């Protein structure tokens, strides 16, 4: 089985998350995409202290109508920071027959040298870099820490970095939705409409539960 991994705080989940997951699923013929909310993200302060369970509930609502999308709360049961490499290792142990594709935004990939045990990520699964409009595939090579560039071969025609482990880093261009969870929280905090920025079920849940009414 080919499985995508999309992690994040999902505070809240929005339509760009869903569209990126769907584009990766379609492009790479994935059987499923696992949405994995971060319990304690190492690179991002949790603005507003929205509980992990609430963020998981929003993702479940957002993905309920797509049989290829699933939600895992595995990071909620693990103490300490939610490091991606630990999640990937746990998934590989749980699903030893799966081929994994770790989905990451281009902004995050440019900073991957600061991630915990980042070298092990490249040696554990494929990566798909979802690019913002205007970003170039050549940025893949430029973003790699100098210490590990020799571990890769770059194939510009395929927009792919091949790692010596046999896994690859793929560049997915043309993801046009520039939506941020921060801006959605700001609108919700002010009582403004967030319609069409999040799925209808998520909008209703946010409004009914007043999740961001007292945020910030």
From Swiss-Prot:
Keywords: ATP-binding, NAD, Nucleotide-binding, Nucleotidyltransferase, Pyridine nucleotide biosynthesis, Transferase
Name listed for the protein in its UniProt record: Probable nicotinate-nucleotide adenylyltransferase
Signal peptide: none
Pathway annotation from the record: Cofactor biosynthesis; NAD(+) biosynthesis; deamido-NAD(+) from nicotinate D-ribonucleotide: step 1/1
Source organism superkingdom: Bacteria
InterPro entries assigned to the protein according to its UniProt record, in alphabetical order: Cyt_trans-like, NadD/NMNAT, Rossmann-like_a/b/a_fold
CDD domains, sorted: NMNAT
Molecular function (Gene Ontology), one example: nicotinate-nucleotide adenylyltransferase activity
